[in-house]
């Protein structure tokens, strides 16, 4: 696959980005993706099994993972910077600010800013030589234009098909991507429902210059998600996922008893914060402990397309190879 603007920008071989996911995208996974030629990204609470309300400890947790990634790869990798912790138990700007400071101190190659208001961090990050991607929330044309004006290097557009929080607008990937591509000059990275080369070829035909995959990387050997989560993804069908509304947007997840209860809550008029208060404390119980009855199993609608646990390197290689074959054939 020929290198494009995104590859040149990030210094990577293939335009494949592993999406940062809460608790389960630690240094080992990020480094494996980067070593395979993509871009691995450390997520919030990476490598941890307990939550903290301490601002300083939050920063040090991130620092430990960055140092670990540096020991595992010499290739570019990234870290996630949340601009808002709307449902964080400690709340507030202080957590974002401390993670931002640690990122500057450690001098990593790439940052993926998630949330609204990225402009407050962009200049200092870029002045430090860090490439800045924005995973918009909200994710729409207006947000992409604002990100471009703020100096963001590339915009990550995740459609409603994705897992985790995808904003409130509920725009499907194949409607979202071409509209954003038409609206901005910076590279657009597509996410939401992409697990293989077919999806990669499709969004690149729509004008995207890279893919942003989360759910596919859950079902990898390097991901610390519980085996029950990976097995549930392998057994998923086209009707195995569900969405509910939280304060950070729509959440995509497997249709577990807990998530069905959230659907009932939403239908009966519960607020997004009340729903979040119900599912959020159960992330670890689901993703790390594998408790199907009581846990939250976050993933995208694409889960039904995944049939095998692979290494991160296999995922990168197979996605790129299949996309190349399809694009050559068209």
Question: What label would you give each PLM region?
Answer:
Residues 167-189, 195-330:
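Conserved active-site-proximal phosphate/metal-binding subdomains
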């Amino acid at each position: 696959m020929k290198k494009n603007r995104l590859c040149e920008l990030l210094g990577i071989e293939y335009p494949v980005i592993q999406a940062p996911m809460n608790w389960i995208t630690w240094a080992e996974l990020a480094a494996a993706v980067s070593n395979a030629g993509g871009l691995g990204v450390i997520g919030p609470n990476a490598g941890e099994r307990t939550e903290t309300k301490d601002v300083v400890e939050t920063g040090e947790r991130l620092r430990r993972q960055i140092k670990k990634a540096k020991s595992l790869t010499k290739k570019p990798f990234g870290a996630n910077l949340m601009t808002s912790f709307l449902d964080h138990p400690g709340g507030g700007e202080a957590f974002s600010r401390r993670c931002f400071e640690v990122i500057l101190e450690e001098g990593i190659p790439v940052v993926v800013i998630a949330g609204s208001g990225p402009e407050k961090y962009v200049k200092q990050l870029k002045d430090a030589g860090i490439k800045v991607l924005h995973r918009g929330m909200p994710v729409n044309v207006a947000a992409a234009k604002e990100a471009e004006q703020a100096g963001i290097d590339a915009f990550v557009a995740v459609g409603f098909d994705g897992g985790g929080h995808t904003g409130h607008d509920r725009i499907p990937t194949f409607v979202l991507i071409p509209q954003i591509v038409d609206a901005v000059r910076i590279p657009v990275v597509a996410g939401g429902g992409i697990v293989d080369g077919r999806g990669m070829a499709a969004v690149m035909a729509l004008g995207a210059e890279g893919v942003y995959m989360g759910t596919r990387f859950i079902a990898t050997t390097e991901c610390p998600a519980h085996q029950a989560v990976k097995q549930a993804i392998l057994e998923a069908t086209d009707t195995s996922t569900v969405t509910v509304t939280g304060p950070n947007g729509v959440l995509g997840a497997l249709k577990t008893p807990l998530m069905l209860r959230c659907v009932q809550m939403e239908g009966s008029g519960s607020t997004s914060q009340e729903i979040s208060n119900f599912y959020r404390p159960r992330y670890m119980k689901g993703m790390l402990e594998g408790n199907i009855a009581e846990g939250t199993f976050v993933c995208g609608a694409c889960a039904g397309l995944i049939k095998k646990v692979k290494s991160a390197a296999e995922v990168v290689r197979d996605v790129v190879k299949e996309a190349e074959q399809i694009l050559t054939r068209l």
